[in-house]
């Protein structure tokens, strides 16, 4: 059996105003074997154009992995190696760890903005 990784997917509420941010991430927690692909889903109900995936590691602030500025329009962030994204509809932005490695053990955050 291969090494297992623990991915903690946290909900990032980068929103001012009311408490319902209109954004969810799934799964909330993920344990997987190294070498296995893992997909994290960010779902929004606010119809915002911009969506972001970040990771936070001990001793570091948030680091941008990928972002999207519309359906099928995505770009890389500062730590994009080993990740891919897709956004086939406004509501969902998927982050895939192509082949999970121990260096990808992190807290993952999704955010949205207009």
Curated annotation (Swiss-Prot):
It comes from the Eukaryota. It is found in: Cell membrane. Gene3D superfamilies: Immunoglobulins. InterPro entries: Ig-like_dom, Ig-like_dom_sf, Ig-like_fold, Ig_V-set, TCR_beta_variable. Residues 22-114 form the Ig-like domain. Keywords: Adaptive immunity, Cell membrane, Disulfide bond, Immunity, Immunoglobulin domain, Membrane, Receptor, Signal, T cell receptor. Residues 1-21 form the signal peptide. Its main location: membrane. GO terms for biological process: adaptive immune response; cell surface receptor signaling pathway. It holds the Pfam family V-set. GO terms for cellular component: plasma membrane; T cell receptor complex. V region of the variable domain of T cell receptor (TR) beta chain that participates in the antigen recognition. Alpha-beta T cell receptors are antigen specific receptors which are essential to the immune response and are present on the cell surface of T lymphocytes. Recognize peptide-major histocompatibility (MH) (pMH) complexes that are displayed by antigen presenting cells (APC), a prerequisite for efficient T cell adaptive immunity against pathogens. Disulfide bonds join 42-110. The keyword Disulfide bond applies. Alpha-beta TR is a heterodimer composed of an alpha and beta chain; disulfide-linked. The alpha-beta TR is associated with the transmembrane signaling CD3 coreceptor proteins to form the TR-CD3 (TcR or TCR). The assembly of alpha-beta TR heterodimers with CD3 occurs in the endoplasmic reticulum where a single alpha-beta TR heterodimer associates with one CD3D-CD3E heterodimer, one CD3G-CD3E heterodimer and one CD247 homodimer forming a stable octameric structure. CD3D-CD3E and CD3G-CD3E heterodimers preferentially associate with TR alpha and TR beta chains, respectively. The gene is TRBV10-3. This is T cell receptor beta variable 10-3.
């Amino acid at each position: 059996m291969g090494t297992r990784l623990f991915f903690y997917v946290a909900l990032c509420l980068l929103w001012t105003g009311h408490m319902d941010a209109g954004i969810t991430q799934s799964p909330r927690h993920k344990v997987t074997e190294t070498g296995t692909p893992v997909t994290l889903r960010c779902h929004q109900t606010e119809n915002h154009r911009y969506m972001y995936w970040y990771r936070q590691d001990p001793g570091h602030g948030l680091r941008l992995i990928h972002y999207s500025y519309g359906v099928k329009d995505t770009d890389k962030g500062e730590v994009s190696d080993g990740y891919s994204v897709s956004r086939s509809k406004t509501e969902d932005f998927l982050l895939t760890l192509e082949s999970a490695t121990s260096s990808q053990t992190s807290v993952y955050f999704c955010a949205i903005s207009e």
